[in-house]
Amino acid sequence: MRYMTSEEIREAFLKFFEKKGHKILPSASLIPDDPQLLFTVAGMVPFKPIFWGKVEPVYTRVATCQKCLRTVDIENVGKTPRHHTFFEMLGNFSFGDYFKEEAIEWAWEFLTQVLGVPEEKLWVSVYEEDEEAFRIWNEKIGLPEKRILRMGKEDNFWGPAGPTGPCGPDTEIFYDTGYSKGCPEGEGCTPANSEGRFVEIWNLVFTEYYQDEEGKLHPLPRKNIDTGAGLERFCAMMQGVYSNFDTDLFQPIIKRIEELTGVGYKTDEEKDVSIRVIADHIRAITFLISEGVFPSNEGRGYVLRRIIRRAMRHGILLGMSEPFLYRIVDAVVEKMGKVYPEIVRGEGMVKEVLSAEENRFLKTLEQGMKVFDEIVEKKGKIDSEDAFRLYDTYGLPLELTLEIAKEKGVEVDVQEFNKYMEEQQRKSRAAMGDVEFARRYEYLEKLPKDFRTEFTGYEKLEDEGEVVLVARDDETVEEASEGTVEVVFSRTPFYAEKGGQVSDTGMVEWRDGKALVEYVFEASEGVIVHRIKILDGTLRRGQKVILRVDKKRREATMRNHTATHLLHAALKKVLGDHVRQAGSLVAPDRLRFDFTHFKGLSSAEIEQVEDLVNEWIMEAIPVEVRYTSYEEAVKSGVVALFTEKYGDVVRVVEVPGVSKELCGGTHVKNTGQIGLFKIISEESVSSGVRRIEAVTGFSALELLRNQKKLIDQLKEILGAREDELTDRVLSLREKVKELEKKLSQGRISEERIAMKQLEDGVKVFHGVFEGVEAKHLGGIADNVLKKEGEGIVILFSKFENKVSLVVKVSENLLGKYDASSIARNIAKELGGNGGGRKNFAQAGGRHPERIKDVLERLEEFLR
């Protein structure tokens, strides 16, 4: 076998299958269009709707090199030669086209003829009941029977993903590395019993059955092929190394880690583990952030934060005490940027986000480690509640707590940890309110298989359609005469909520009836559902209707959507190319735009952005819409979002010279129709993500009117001109502060302060006040001693269900009495603490109701 680089292997695979009639598609995003998955975990994920029969394939033969991310075995990453978080999966797919024979023959041809792998190095396994696959391997390929293993369902049968669905047998191809640890002598060593000698390099899945609710298998009318081969494993095979980390995919990254840490690879096994963890994790981190995932405490952001913190923890084990991961990003970009240009474009952003997260975690880790040590010192172990507190308060992932505990030889009981997590999530959901999430809309199965709603809303705001389906409470009905129902029409001008743009609303009318359209959504690919409230009449399946979109609402939404594109372009121009969309809301009354940036915008920057957007509006630039292939659109420099799903033909919305984005939303004909653009707020959403809210058109006009009314009211109240308002308000604020101080002191001076004389003749002055802030009590105590000359002053103030306390001792009594000691004694009784100097001390407590008891026993606390 000749040495091949990762680039050569990747290119050879795709070219081979292109010659076999496959359409070569670019890698889909790591963020799948699947609510059940956080990440793309396999090459077949982008094609799930096809495998499930929900979408007709554009191409029947496809091949890809797909970016994937898995964290299910993250604890093994770095400890084994082949566990990874981020990896690339080579795959060829057939959707009702070729089947087992071609899939097996082509896999064998690629391995033995293109890559030049010696035949004697290859073994396979097949499902024990799959005689067809066995026969192809044995008779067509000529593989000896002894190198074809028959395995059970657990090893060689894929799916279904749930209780029901597509499934089928698979065949796995193994490469013999010759590494013989733990393997029986002689010919007894096989992929079934070796410990690491045989590496699975390719899995061919034959999706030919459908499993029903009873577990019975039914032949599929259209059989599919789904194959997956890890590029990292192919590289190890073709580069003659046992570990994936010794391939050209990882070595440049490992060299960079060696430079930064001063620790050589393969000099110490424990340190080697840490180097491998960092080398693996930095790839995942770079790709995730470049695709718009940012560290947070939930969902994808939490997974990213967990990966970052695990990598940092291993950096600390290598002696790193400051941020360092962001300095390895360039090694990843240099190695993989030609294949995945998104990491080149996002390099600056990745470094900024990562550096900020590293700094944050170092502070958190310092605090968390102190708490960890305190808990261990007190209890000798970490229990579930402690582990959850370390996570919830100090941001230490459970996995990191377990690793630290293991290193310190400390027991960790995490049996109840998940219960605490579930309770927190329950509270979070309750705080958010009821959210409709991942409804199945099973009633849509009653629609014809290839049904798609014809959307006419780009050209029309009114159209005629036919009722195709009516559903109430997730059940189809023939007719409905009152209440809220969900309806599918044959065609509609109503825009379904998508891509951040809210849905249209309006009316549906038919002979003797009408209904209010409250919400419109796309429940499955191309099927638009209208949630309507029937006002009059009876709506029946098959009925002809007129659908009318609320024109003013649509036009306002269009203004805001086009303005969002202009805002995105302006932010890039003012702040830099690292700015990327991280979320949006386009509604008729406002727009909201989340974007990547690492600090708040200054007033000058906000003005620059506003000025740019309004300049483009005043230029009345025509907004152009065209349809093209995804590949051509990306080549032309269009902005595409990784969180959006795009088909083979895409819609490009362009404001010439300003903005060019893939977008399915509704837009104005030219920018002048937006009227006016005004930012109303700018704030942080999460680490590295900012949010701008803005208004346009009549909403902007209303904002200006309201501000003018407010200014006029202030002018009238303050008796000042507009240019005098700021100075007048500042002056009034200072006067209020001074008056509050005088008022407080004046009120207190009128209060009766009692005096108690001790046996030694010392006078103790004490008083209890309501609502006096603690900061004023010291001044009152000073006034009392000035007036009385000498003594001890003890003053209490009840404030917001708490109690504040000051103690003042005159100079001549300091040899006998200590204000700090007195304050601590009293505070302990009041459920608090305090302290200070011998002559003056302050304290606080949680039980103001105990003040009376303290005063009755005052002499006890003076000792």
UniProtKB/Swiss-Prot annotation:
Gene: alaS
UniProt remark on domains: Consists of three domains; the N-terminal catalytic domain, the editing domain and the C-terminal C-Ala domain. The editing domain removes incorrectly charged amino acids, while the C-Ala domain, along with tRNA(Ala), serves as a bridge to cooperatively bring together the editing and aminoacylation centers thus stimulating deacylation of misacylated tRNAs.
Binding, Zn(2+): H561, H565, C663, H667
Organism: Thermotoga maritima (strain ATCC 43589 / DSM 3109 / JCM 10099 / NBRC 100826 / MSB8)
Function of the protein: Catalyzes the attachment of alanine to tRNA(Ala) in a two-step reaction: alanine is first activated by ATP to form Ala-AMP and then transferred to the acceptor end of tRNA(Ala). Also edits incorrectly charged Ser-tRNA(Ala) and Gly-tRNA(Ala) via its editing domain.
Descriptive protein name: Alanine--tRNA ligase
Molecular-function GO terms, alphabetical: alanine-tRNA ligase activity; aminoacyl-tRNA deacylase activity; ATP binding; tRNA binding; zinc ion binding
Highest taxon listed in the record's lineage: Bacteria
EC number: 6.1.1.7
Cofactor note: Binds 1 zinc ion per subunit.
InterPro entries membership: aa-tRNA-synth_II/BPL/LPL, Ala-tRNA-lgiase_IIc, Ala-tRNA-ligase_IIc_anticod-bd, Ala-tRNA-synth_IIc_core, Ala-tRNA-synth_IIc_N, Ala-tRNA_ligase, Ala_tRNA_ligase_euk/bac, DHHA1_dom
GO cellular component, one term: cytosol
Catalytic activity: tRNA(Ala) + L-alanine + ATP = L-alanyl-tRNA(Ala) + AMP + diphosphate
GO biological process: alanyl-tRNA aminoacylation
Entry cofactors: Zn(2+)
